[in-house]
Swiss-Prot record:
The keyword Secreted appears for this protein: yes
Broadest EC class assigned to this enzyme: hydrolase
GO BP terms: proteolysis
PROSITE patterns: CARBOXYPEPT_SER_SER
Glycan-modified residues: 284, 377, 440, 448
Name of protein: Probable serine carboxypeptidase ARB_06414
Xref: PANTHER family: CARBOXYPEPTIDASE, SERINE PROTEASE FAMILY S10 SERINE CARBOXYPEPTIDASE
Organism, scientific name: Arthroderma benhamiae (strain ATCC MYA-4681 / CBS 112371)
């Protein structure tokens, strides 16, 4: 998910005779090639989950849903059947004159364990399209950076649960010379806070439930980045309704979330982040001293040392008001962008060249090669998925909120603790290569929260996140196995840190994100097994 603005082998010498006696060593010509090897370790078994394209009958097709039906064999550039799905605009109220509508794309699952649930996915921004999540993170087909065509996604969340990707509220623009805005959702700006966003989303979702006969289904709400506000506020609003026929919310999960003030999430942990990934930030001694001096002078160094502790010593004090002289995050971004002009704030291990992205945004900034088109801006694509024929952009540069200001408090202050109390499981996950929002900022936020009768975690997250080994499958959808992170749970809140993972967890670490979803849904009870 984009958003939060547009910002980043050594070989041992071996004696030839000794090498000859070691049959497992490879020649230099063989470096990079993988030999198949048997593993006596836990494995994923996908055999019980039939591919979505094998569906013989449409499970949700009826008179009410027919207008939303998508022909899974006629998605432009997709050379396989994506299966049963429904897409289009749904109004946010039952008013006959309602002009505000949210765009959705709904995929029923073939997994029998999913029959009594629905999972909602929201991207963030604010002002970024959830179709990015569908196409490049966790949908049934993927078209990722630098690839020629869409491919089937073996880690599609539709293999586990019924999924609906919903584009957040987006204002239309009366100026025809400018893009209509993010995604396909329609309406003039009217939201001033997350409470307003939640109210409108619940209006949409009630209509969605009525249309697809999903009454009483357990609801899981998942999102990333600025959805660290959307998800808990929407869940809180659903709990407050006390109406399980329409709003039977079960649990929530947020990836790399915006849950606190920017100073905590970005400025305070910036210099320790650079130190941890020193090889990716090859600064000279002069600049390294400069950013350390900035962090010391602005109180960031002492703040980290004193408050990122387990258990916490008490409520975290407010930081002094931010000044340009204390903007160490931007100083680092500007400096590393000189060394690595393709620096990606969403995944800091990225280097040049910039890869082609069919959504036009392959890193810290927009980029589309000459002659290329943004996929969802194509008329044939829009017709195939029941979208309005209009200009589509992945992220809007125009304000989503009235006057460009979200008047809500950060979700970690009050809303997330309330949601944790009312849910069987709440998960906060964070990629360790994310610079746009830094994992230690999320941990600081958790250590400042009070829920379940205590503040923060009593222990630092340290348990291994284990992903079962699996067949490599297609080279186009490789994903890791083994220990891919660390995790910790206390009082129904689970924190997961994903190793070698950027801002968009399901994009950069699909197998681990799939595993975490299994835990959220209650399909597994231990992330270390």
């Amino acid at each position: 998910m984009r958003g939060l603005s547009y910002f980043v082998l050594a070989l041992s010498a071996i004696d030839a005779a000794a090498a000859a006696s070691l049959p497992f060593l490879r020649s230099l010509q063989h470096v990079g090639r993988r030999d198949p090897a048997a593993r006596n370790l836990p494995n994923y078994d996908f055999s019980a989950i039939p591919p979505v394209e094998k569906r013989q009958t449409a499970s949700r097709l009826n008179g009410k849903t027919k207008k939303y039906a998508v022909d899974g064999t006629k998605i432009p550039e997709v050379q396989f059947d994506i299966g049963e799905s429904y897409a289009g605009l749904m109004p946010i109220s039952t008013r006959k004159d309602e002009s505000r509508e949210l765009y959705f794309w709904y995929f029923p699952s073939e997994n029998p364990a999913a029959k009594d649930e629905i999972t909602i996915w929201l991207n963030g921004g604010p002002g970024c399209s959830s179709l990015e999540g569908l196409l490049q993170e966790n949908g049934p087909f993927l078209w990722q950076y630098g690839t020629l065509y869409p491919v089937p996604n073996p880690w599609s969340w539709t293999k586990l649960t019924n999924m609906v990707w919903v584009e957040q509220y987006n204002p239309t623009d009366d100026n025809p010379s400018r893009p209509v805005g993010t995604g396909f959702s329609q309406g003039k700006p009217s939201v001033r806070s997350q409470e307003d966003v939640a109210t409108q989303f619940l209006g949409f979702f009630r209509n969605f439930v009525d249309t697809f006969d999903l009454h009483g289904k357990k609801i899981y709400i998942v999102g990333e980045s600025y959805a660290g506000l959307y998800v808990p506020y929407i869940a809180h609003a659903m709990f407050e309704k006390k109406n399980k026929r329409y709003f039977n919310v079960e649990s929530t999960m947020i990836f790399d979330p915006s849950i606190n003030k920017d100073e905590i999430l970005t400025q305070v942990p910036a210099v320790p982040f650079v130190e941890h990934w020193k090889g990716l930030f090859p600064f000279n001694e002069t600049f390294t001293k400069q950013i350390h001096d900035m962090a010391d002078k602005c109180g960031y160094s002492s703040y980290m040392k004193e408050h990122l502790v387990y258990p916490p010593k008490g409520k975290l004090p407010a930081l002094p008001k931010a000044t340009p002289e204390c903007d160490v995050w931007t100083a680092i971004f500007d400096a590393v962008s000189l060394v690595n002009p393709c620096f990606d704030v969403y995944q800091v291990a990225t280097t040049c060249p910039l890869l082609y992205d069919v959504l036009g945004y392959p890193g810290s900034f927009e980029y589309l090669p000459a002659g290329a088109n943004v996929y969802f801006n194509r008329t044939d694509v829009q017709k195939a998925i029941n979208a309005p024929l209009q200009k589509w952009t992945e992220c809007s540069e125009r304000p989503v909120f009235v006057d460009g200001k979200d008047n809500s408090e950060p979700s970690s202050f009050t809303i997330i603790p309330d949601v944790i109390e009312k849910s069987p499981r709440t998960i906060i996950a964070h990629g360790d290569l994310d610079y746009v929002l830094i994992s230690n900022g999320t941990l600081l936020s958790i250590q400042n929260m009070t829920w379940g009768g205590a503040q923060g975690f009593s222990q630092e997250p340290s348990k291994p996140l284990f992903v079962p080994y699996h067949d490599r499958g297609s080279l186009s959808t490789l994903s890791g196995a083994g220990v891919l992170g660390r995790h910790h749970t206390e009082r129904k809140l689970t924190y997961v840190e994903l190793y070698l993972t950027g801002h968009m967890g399901p994009q950069y670490n699909p197998s681990a994100s799939y595993r975490i979803l299994e835990y959220l849904l209650g399909r597994i009870d231990d992330l270390s097994k």
